């Protein structure tokens, strides 16, 4: 076979809410794991990992979530695919992203597998600057994740072109201890 094959991974974004009022107001937390291996060792990241050869993507998302956080049995929905060839220093990686939402008191989180820790973080993303350049609408966002033990900040650039076909890209300008 003459084509090199990329690696496939899944990541799962799990949001939690304290009660119905918090859900209505959009006060959510996100479940993150502290990476125990390279790349980005010691940084906080979404739970995820590599797809086994004979494994469906959704099964990978569920397996990695359970292995890294102890959380299982959640409904998951695929919402995006990321494939920038330079996004991972290890190899050419294509990631299918999944989403779930749960009442925080319904799950117990415990780090496992290659995760050094797992925890809920409050999230806040505020637009800092917005401008147009070369036909793109660009907005820089200040992303903050925090819990009772720590706080991390990142700067994300969103590039968007609207029309019949919308193009949207995200660029991490400053990671700040968040593996992205």
Name the predicted role of every residue range.
Residues 1-45, 58, 73:
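N-terminal strand-loop-strand
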Residues 51-180:
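Unchanged
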